[in-house]
Each structure stands twice: as structure tokens, then as C-alpha cells.
């Protein structure tokens, strides 16, 4: 009998055909599912920190504040397969893709800047920032046709241990959401740094500028002796001045302080940063005194506060600020976002001086809310000043290398119960009656440490960065605070599987099921043949 017409051969042929069909079907289904999973972001985030998942806080913030009427273009400066092969870049990619999956007005593109450098040329010109293959650019066009963009380096998306420089967390969600909100605003509010007072253009100013930039400000510098503040200015920053501000007199027509007064009258905000080495500047300090801010001095020497029990350094001068717990106070309201965390972050004040009672202000205890504050009222002007951070009760004041005695502290007004311990940061609010039953406000925030904004202090290990964004949100009329938590790694090692190992696992997981089916088919065919 011809073997081709035998019953065994027919059964074997059917089994083999069925096996081949099943294998082909498995491969086809796998290819289709892979394509759909990539398009629709079907994946399970198995990291303990949910690195690849957008938090509910980020989704809620975007839902409330993101302008969906503007087209946003996110540019990765490398091809997608290269991004997927890098653990760090893959985190950034998945964050952006998950956001883009929620909003149709976000387009994501991949550009090889080495073969197509012109694709990012305009961004380089606009931002004056270096752009490389690891850069991520978020861009949109405002109502005036002007480009608004934010350029992120890969390093800026991660948090590092300040002592070991090891990666400890992923902060891309905060960076990207902030950028999306910033570039889609109809008009960016301006933050101006004052110049021409001996300010040293050091790294601390650069880091503070970056915080304001990320928060949504167009950051500029201004010489108030020669220029007026732009109409869109919402914040003026006075940072570590070494010479005085000019006030109008018979020999001088320039009046910087009059410009600041008018600016604050228009319901805007000022930040001032001083320290233990800030010289006596009579004009500026008269202005600050009017706003409840007075630098504490002993015999014309600024105090330097040593808080050994709450210091990050053995010298005792890198002080951890104590949160204000007085209910109902503006200082407590400003830090509520930090204190509401399960483990509130430390806010650090390196090399800090202190503030004392300002002339003309009266200390008040709001018995209903238990909040201590200072109040001022004269000629229709009403201001209240609140501490935001203080030292511990054990802190010491040093002047000229010597610890001050109690009698010396009393002589400079540092025994008032409302300001003990020493004040590191204060916020003053001026109240404006709009005449229609509503109120509006002007603000001045003063910090007694210029190192408050140094790189290590703004690391997401501490709360300095978030505190500044909360302050911008409270004081700025046109600024949305973005203070999403960093995702800290359970291990400081970002990934322990290489790209080649991942490829091997993929091949194994794809081939093993298909091979098993093939082998089973062969076994069945042989058994039936010899049955």
C-alpha cells in the first residue's frame, strides 16, 4: 500500500499542519498584541515604587490646569529603540507616553540629532541651553506666536544622594508636568532678579532661577535704576545684595524702592534672601522694616545661628528649620503641603542669620487659632507678618565669634515669645480691600540664608525646593504650583538587567511556548504512526 495514502500518514500530516498553524497563530497573536500594547501602553508596572505609572496627583493636576487648546510637541533627541534600551531614558519615555496617551494635543517625536541637528536648532537658540542625545524638549506656541519650551537633561530627572552622588529617586513626573503647564500658559508671568547691588552671580542664583523657571516663570534680570519692571512681572527677587538700593533725593533721581512699592501695591510679590554676612544697607532695610522684616544684629554684627541639636553638620551651622505648628497662621498654611506628608521633609537653612521684631509692628496671639504673628496698621495700610520656620529652643546666637547672653538678646528684641526661638523665614501679607466685599493681597517673603537655594539644599531629599514652589503658588497670581513627590528607589541601582539580557529573556519567552507545542505535535504524530 502506498504510504502517502495510509491512514497513519494522513493523521500525521494533519497533526503537523495543526502544529504549524498553532505556532503561526501564536506568533501572529504575539505580534498583534505587542503592537497594541505599545500603542495603548498595556503593561503592568511591577516596580515597588510605581516608576512607570503616572500618579493620581499628577493626573488630577493636569486635569485641572493643563491647557488642552494648545498643541504641545515633546521631542526626544534619540530614536525610540535607543531610549527603550536605557533604563533611565525608558523611565522618562514612559512618563511622557502615558501623559500623551491622555491628551490628544500632545505629540511625541524622536529625532536623531546627530543626523538631523537642524531639528533642534530653534530650541538651542531660544533657550541657550546645551542639547544632546539625552535631552527631552517640551514646546508649544503662545497666543502671540512666540515659542515657549523647556529643555530637560536626563540628569535633571533624577535625585541624587548629596553625600555619595548615587541615584536615589526619579523626579521626572514633577519636571514634565511642570513643563507642560508652563509652556501652555497664555502668557508667562515674569520673575525679575534685581542687579547692580554687588550681587554675585553664583550657582545659588542659578539654582533658584531654575526653580522659578520650572515653576512657570519667565526669569529675567533687571537694573531698577535704568529700567521699569515689565508689565507681566509678578515676582521680584532680591538676592544677597552687597550695596544699597537707591532712594530718590536731591542728588539722585533714580528710586528703586519707589518702583518696588508701586509693584507691591499692584498685588504682586517680592522674595528677599540675606545671610549673616549681608552688610547694613539703610535704604533697603528701611523698606524691609516696613514689611515686618528686620535683620537681627548685635553691635552692628549680624547674628549667626548655631543649632547643634538640629544641624546636618558637626559645626552646628547647617540648621534644620522647625515647622510652625500654630494653627491658622500664614506660615503654617505655607508649609501645609509638606507637613501633611507621612514623613515631612527637612527644610535646611545653612549658615543662617535671624530676623527680629520690626519697628512699628505689634506682636499678637490669635487665641482662636493659637497663631503668633505681627501686625501693622497705619494710614489705611494693613500688614501681618508670620514666621514660616524657626530654630529649636536650644539654638544659640553667635556674633563676632561669641555666644550672646540673654541680656544681650533682650537688648536687640529677641526675647519676645512670638519670635522665640530664632526666626529663619518670614512672610508678610498686605491686605487690600477691593471695595466689593473681597480682598486681594501683596506678599514679601524673607529668608535668612542665601545658601537655602544651593544645589544640595534643593535636592529632593529636602523640602527646600517644594517650599519655594508652594510660596510661588501662594504669592503668585498666575503661577500653578507643581509639587509632585519624588519616586525614591528601594535600591539606588536603577536597573540590574542589561538590554542584551532583556533581549535574551524575550527570545526565550517567545520561543519556548512555540517549541513546546511543536514537540508535542511531533510526539503525537509519531505515536499515532506506530499505534
Question: Residue spans of the language-model regions?
Answer:
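Short, surface-exposed patches at the edges or C-terminal ends of soluble domains, predominantly
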Residues: 2-531
Amino acid at each position: 500500500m502506498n504510504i502517502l495514502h495510509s491512514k497513519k500518514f494522513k493523521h500525521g500530516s494533519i497533526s503537523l499542519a495543526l502544529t504549524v498553524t498553532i505556532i503561526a497563530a501564536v506568533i501572529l497573536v504575539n505580534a498583534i498584541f505587542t503592537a497594541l500594547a505599545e500603542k495603548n501602553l498595556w503593561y503592568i508596572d511591577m516596580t515597588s515604587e510605581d516608576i512607570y505609572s503616572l500618579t493620581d496627583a499628577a493626573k488630577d493636576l493636569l486635569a485641572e490646569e493643563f491647557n488642552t487648546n494648545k498643541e504641545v510637541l515633546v521631542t526626544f533627541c534619540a530614536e525610540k529603540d535607543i531610549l527603550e534600551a536605557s533604563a533611565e531614558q525608558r523611565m522618562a519615555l514612559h512618563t511622557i507616553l502615558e501623559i500623551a496617551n491622555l491628551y490628544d494635543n500632545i505629540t511625541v517625536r524622536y529625532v536623531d540629532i546627530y543626523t538631523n541637528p537642524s531639528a533642534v536648532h530653534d530650541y538651542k537658540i531660544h533657550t541657550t541651553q546645551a542639547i544632546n542625545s539625552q535631552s527631552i524638549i517640551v514646546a508649544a506656541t503662545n497666543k502671540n506666536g512666540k515659542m515657549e519650551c523647556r529643555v530637560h537633561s536626563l540628569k535633571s530627572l533624577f535625585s541624587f544622594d548629596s553625600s555619595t552622588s548615587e541615584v536615589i529617586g526619579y523626579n521626572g513626573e514633577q519636571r514634565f508636568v511642570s513643563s507642560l503647564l508652563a509652556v501652555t500658559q497664555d502668557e508667562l508671568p515674569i520673575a525679575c532678579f534685581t542687579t547692580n547691588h554687588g550681587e554675585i552671580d553664583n550657582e545659588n542664583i542659578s539654582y533658584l532661577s531654575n526653580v522659578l523657571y520650572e515653576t512657570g516663570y519667565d526669569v529675567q534680570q533687571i537694573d531698577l535704576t535704568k529700567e521699569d519692571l515689565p508689565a507681566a512681572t509678578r515676582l521680584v527677587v532680591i538676592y544677597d545684595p552687597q550695596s544699597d538700593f537707591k532712594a530718590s533725593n536731591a542728588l539722585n533721581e533714580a528710586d528703586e524702592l519707589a518702583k518696588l512699592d508701586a509693584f507691591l501695591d499692584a498685588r504682586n510679590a517680592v522674595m528677599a534672601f540675606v545671610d549673616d554676612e549681608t552688610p547694613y544697607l539703610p535704604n533697603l532695610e528701611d523698606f524691609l522694616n516696613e514689611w515686618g522684616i528686620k535683620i537681627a544684629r548685635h553691635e552692628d554684627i549680624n547674628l549667626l545661628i548655631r543649632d547643634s541639636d538640629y544641624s546636618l553638620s558637626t559645626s552646628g551651622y547647617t540648621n534644620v528649620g522647625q515647622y510652625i505648628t500654630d494653627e491658622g497662621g500664614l506660615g503654617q498654611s505655607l508649609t501645609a503641603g509638606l507637613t501633611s506628608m507621612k514623613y515631612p521633609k527637612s527644610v535646611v537653612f545653612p549658615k543662617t542669620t535671624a530676623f527680629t521684631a520690626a519697628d512699628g509692628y505689634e506682636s499678637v496671639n490669635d487665641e482662636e487659632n493659637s497663631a503668633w504673628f505681627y501686625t501693622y496698621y497705619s494710614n489705611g495700610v494693613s500688614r501681618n507678618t508670620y514666621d514660616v520656620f524657626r530654630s529649636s529652643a536650644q539654638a544659640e546666637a553667635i556674633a563676632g565669634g561669641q555666644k550672646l547672653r540673654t541680656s544681650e538678646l533682650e537688648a536687640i528684641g529677641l526675647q519676645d515669645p512670638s519670635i522665640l526661638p530664632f526666626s529663619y523665614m518670614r512672610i508678610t501679607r498686605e491686605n487690600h480691600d477691593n471695595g466689593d466685599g473681597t480682598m486681594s493681597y501683596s506678599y514679601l517673603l524673607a529668608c535668612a540664608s542665601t545658601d537655602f537655594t544651593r544645589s544640595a539644599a534643593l535636592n529632593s531629599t529636602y523640602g527646600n525646593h517644594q517650599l519655594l514652589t508652594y510660596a510661588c503658588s501662594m504669592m503668585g497670581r498666575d503661577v500653578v504650583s507643581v509639587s509632585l513627590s519624588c519616586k525614591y528607589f528601594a535600591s539606588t541601582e536603577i536597573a540590574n538587567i542589561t538590554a542584551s539580557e532583556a533581549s535574551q529573556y524575550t527570545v526565550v519567552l517567545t520561543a519556548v511556548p512555540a517549541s513546546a507545542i511543536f514537540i508535542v505535535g511531533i510526539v503525537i504524530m509519531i505515536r499515532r504512526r506506530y499505534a
